[in-house]
């Protein structure tokens, strides 16, 4: 393979000149040895981003570029970055290059590796079957159900509970469905990745999970590509093993953010709000590979950070276009102590159709939303005039809506250590029955505080008994 020389270094972006007949292809991985202070050298991987002409390529570094100088030799590997795939990746933690970072020894040489850049599956191989994925989380299963093999976005600003919701979904789906999961940590806090790893080790879920991390402290190159590394591992389980896989990406906004960090250095003109002009293309290249084929499915659950709670920002707006279901987390609900803080009126799913979930489920979900919407409209009147000025019918609607609002909250298994309360998993069937009973007024005599942070109606009745209410 060809050998080039470093001609320019601009932070994470490095220009390399090759001989004319040895010019590497776009997306090829290049390697160079970087001297360290202790006299040793460390290998650094670069990825070719564009050709500048005059036999110079512009590359993005996957690690720190400290210690590199002009004139250093750079080798072309002749292929894109590739990561290990298959059963040997389960229970392990990797970086963007597929190197293990969990101190549990190297991956055997015999393990196959796949390039992280690939084409999406052709149209004639895609599956069109629609099937609901039960999560055990009431608000999700009732109002914005997830589709097996679909894409789900968890939208929310900073600190509203996206990562906790993802951790609960990993836990519930692994425990109840026993599926294989791949977790890609893209530009999030290292502490959260650490916590997640130890939680999953304690619960035994880690044995069925591969984890790939490119965290906040890493250069933009690693954060840009780590989602593709995780997706490549998931694709192998789908295409070769014929399995149903869950792909968790936390956070897809950081993927876009990393692209915008290097975009200007690559010489591209910024577009709206300073994002890269290739925003929609980059998002599409990732999202189009996440799909169900005749062989197996990839169901992806992606946390989407919303900068300054502004949903019109180009990054979350571009992600919206690719999703089958959205779970919107609302700061107002966290202030009321309702967790998960999912907004029942803003969250959507294309699966909430009578032909998919059944007529009863559909009717109950729509009645729940109508009751909550009516309550929202009456809140201004209540704030100005008080409850006494409402008609009897409106009073009854408000009281039921408050019970519904509290009953949409529940304790999570992954939050047990913080709350001291046991987590709960509620089946879709039970969820629909319980909400139907609340709407019909069966539980109007039970105080609304009994509905807070519970699982099924049995827990509410138990709580009411403890309060001294006649059940």
Curated annotation (Swiss-Prot):
Catalysed reaction equations from the record: ATP + H2O + 4 H(+)(in) = ADP + phosphate + 5 H(+)(out)
EC number(s) given by UniProt: 7.1.2.2
One Gene Ontology cellular component annotation held by this UniProt entry: plasma membrane
Domain of life: Bacteria
InterPro entries, per the entry: AAA+_ATPase (IPR003593), ATP-synt_VA_C (IPR055190), ATP_synth_F1_bsu (IPR005722), ATPase_a/bsu_AS (IPR020003), ATPase_alpha/beta_chains (IPR050053), ATPase_F1/V1/A1_a/bsu_N (IPR004100), ATPase_F1/V1/A1_a/bsu_N_sf (IPR036121), ATPase_F1/V1/A1_a/bsu_nucl-bd (IPR000194)
Class in the EC hierarchy, top level: translocase
Subcellular localization: Cell membrane
Protein name: ATP synthase subunit beta
Top-level taxonomy: Bacteria, Bacillati, Bacillota, Bacilli, Bacillales
Gene expressing this chain: atpD
């Amino acid at each position: 393979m060809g050998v080039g020389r470093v001609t320019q270094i601009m932070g994470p972006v490095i220009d390399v000149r090759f001989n004319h007949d040895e010019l590497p292809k776009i997306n090829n991985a290049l390697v160079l040895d970087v001297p360290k202070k202790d006299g040793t050298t460390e290998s650094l991987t670069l990825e070719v981003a564009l050709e500048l002409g005059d036999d110079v390529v512009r590359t993005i570094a996957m690690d720190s570029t400290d210690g590199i100088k002009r004139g250093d030799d750079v080798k072309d590997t002749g292929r894109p970055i590739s990561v290990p795939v298959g059963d040997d990746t389960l229970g392990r933690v990797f970086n963007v290059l597929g190197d293990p970072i969990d101190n549990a020894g190297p991956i055997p040489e015999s393990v196959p590796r796949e390039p992280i850049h690939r084409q999406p599956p052709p149209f004639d191989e895609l599956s069109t079957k629609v099937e609901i994925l039960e999560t055990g989380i009431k608000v999700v299963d009732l109002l914005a159900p997830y589709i097996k093999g679909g894409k789900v976005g968890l939208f929310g600003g900073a600190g509203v509970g996206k990562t906790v919701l993802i951790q609960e979904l990993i836990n519930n789906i692994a425990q109840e469905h026993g599926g294989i999961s791949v977790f890609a940590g893209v530009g999030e806090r290292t502490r959260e990745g650490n916590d997640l790893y130890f939680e999953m080790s304690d619960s035994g879920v880690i044995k069925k999970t591969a984890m790939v991390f490119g965290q906040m402290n890493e250069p933009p190159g690693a954060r840009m590509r780590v989602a593709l590394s995780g997706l490549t591992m998931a694709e192998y389980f789908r295409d070769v093993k014929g399995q149903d896989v869950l792909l968790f990406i936390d956070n897809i906004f950081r993927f876009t953010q990393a692209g915008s960090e290097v975009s200007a250095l690559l010489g591209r003109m910024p577009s709206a709000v300073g994002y890269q002009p290739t925003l929609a293309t980059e998002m599409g290249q990732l999202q189009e590979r996440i799909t169900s084929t005749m062989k197996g499915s990839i169901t992806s659950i992606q946390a989407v950070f919303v900068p300054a709670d502004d949903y019109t920002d180009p990054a979350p707006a571009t992600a919206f276009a690719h999703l089958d279901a959205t779970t919107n987390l609302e700061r107002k609900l966290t202030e009321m102590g309702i967790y998960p803080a999912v907004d029942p009126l803003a969250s959507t799913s294309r699966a909430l159709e009578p032909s998919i979930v059944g007529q009863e489920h559909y009717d109950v979900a729509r009645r729940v939303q109508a009751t909550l919407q009516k309550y929202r409209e009456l809140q201004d009147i209540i704030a100005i005039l008080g409850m006494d000025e409402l008609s009897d019918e409106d009073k009854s609607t408000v009281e039921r809506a408050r019970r519904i609002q509290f009953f949409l909250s529940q304790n999570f298994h992954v939050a047990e250590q913080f709350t001291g309360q046991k987590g709960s998993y509620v089946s879709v069937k039970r969820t629909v029955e319980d909400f139907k009973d609340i709407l019909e007024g069966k539980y109007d005599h039970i105080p609304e505080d009994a509905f807070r942070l519970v699982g099924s109606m049995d827990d509410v009745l138990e709580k009411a008994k403890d309060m001294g209410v006649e059940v």
